[in-house]
């Protein structure tokens, strides 16, 4: 069915405009298209570059490692597009539309920005997401039977009286160990569908969630605190678990919601996180 996986006239996938040969198995994901160049300026060689809408992709070499950097844009819906198309590039025969007999694993490393919800996580620090909670249930559109969520569901029902089905997804243990260090905080990331109301912000419209932040920051599961709010990580983790890829998410903490603080130099903090990731990739 040509309407399921849509290809462009040149055979590239619809949104990313990539062909299989353009893609490395090691992929850095960022939200902002302008952040792609902040990473690839460190590369020794650029092999390929393309942009369509907010999706900018550059493949090149850093310390002899072939790496693709892709901007996803903002939010769960964009991650759904990007991960489906990345998986199709390596696991679908684009000529026939059939699934390949031998499936490939991608290594997905997100470099993002986030706001902390605990007062012991300072602005300008780095945070690596051990797990991530899809608080708005975006991935419930998919068959999640292969995800073992019973333990977390029991916890959230019993300790927080939340009866809705909320899923918690794990990072790749291998990548977590690779990128974790004493220089970073770690914990559970809360992935929200938006920036304002779903993260407890009220500007001119009142928020229908009372004490939203107070409830979220009390989550403590499997020896990890809920640490930060953002809009992508749980979808990356959940889809990677379902599709068989490895994923890790690192965030530059630009705000602390508890302390009502924001970074005085966010660009510098993001640059520092980029350096941290590239040294360990």
Model-derived features: positions:
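Metabolite-binding pocket within alpha/beta catalytic cores that recognizes anionic/polar moieties
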Residues: 1-167
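Glycine-rich beta-alpha junction loops
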Residues: 115, 132, 190-197, 235, ...
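Active-site rim beta-loop-alpha module in soluble metabolic enzymes
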Residues: 152-221
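Polyanion-binding loop/helix "lid" in catalytic or ligand-binding cores
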Residues: 167-171, 228-233
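Short pre-catalytic strand/loop immediately N-terminal to key active-site residues, enriched for Gly-Thr
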Residues: 223-227
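Short glycine-rich, acidic/polar surface loops and turns
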Residues: 229-245
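His/Asp/Glu-rich mid-to-C-terminal helical/loop segments that flank catalytic regions of hydrolases
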Residues: 256-281
């Amino acid at each position: 069915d040509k309407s399921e996986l849509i290809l462009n006239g040149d055979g590239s996938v619809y949104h990313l405009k990539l062909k299989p040969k353009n893609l490395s198995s090691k992929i850095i994901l960022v939200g902002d298209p302008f952040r792609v160049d902040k990473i690839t300026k460190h590369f020794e060689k650029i092999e390929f570059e393309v942009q369509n809408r907010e999706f900018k992709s550059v493949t090149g070499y850093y310390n002899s490692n072939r790496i693709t950097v892709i901007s996803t844009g903002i939010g769960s819906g964009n991650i759904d597009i990007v991960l489906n198309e990345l998986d199709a590039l390596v696991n679908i025969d684009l000529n026939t539309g059939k699934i390949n007999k031998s499936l490939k694993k991608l290594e997905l490393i997100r470099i993002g920005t986030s706001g902390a919800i605990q007062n012991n996580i300072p602005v300008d620090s780095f945070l690596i997401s051990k797990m991530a909670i899809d608080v708005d249930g975006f991935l419930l559109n998919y068959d999640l039977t292969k995800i073992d969520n019973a333990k977390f569901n029991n916890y959230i029902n019993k300790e927080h009286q939340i009866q809705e089905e909320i899923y918690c997804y794990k990072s790749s243990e291998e990548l977590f160990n690779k990128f974790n260090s004493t220089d970073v905080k770690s914990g559970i990331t809360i992935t929200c569908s938006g920036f304002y109301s779903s993260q407890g912000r009220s500007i001119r419209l009142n928020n229908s969630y009372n004490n939203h932040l107070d409830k979220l920051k009390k989550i403590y599961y499997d020896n990890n605190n809920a640490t930060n709010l953002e809009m992508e990580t749980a979808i990356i983790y959940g889809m990677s678990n379902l599709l068989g890829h490895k994923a890790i998410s690192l965030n530059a903490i630009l705000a602390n919601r508890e302390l009502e603080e924001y970074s005085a130099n966010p660009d510098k903090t993001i640059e520092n996180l980029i350096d941290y990731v590239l040294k360990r990739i």
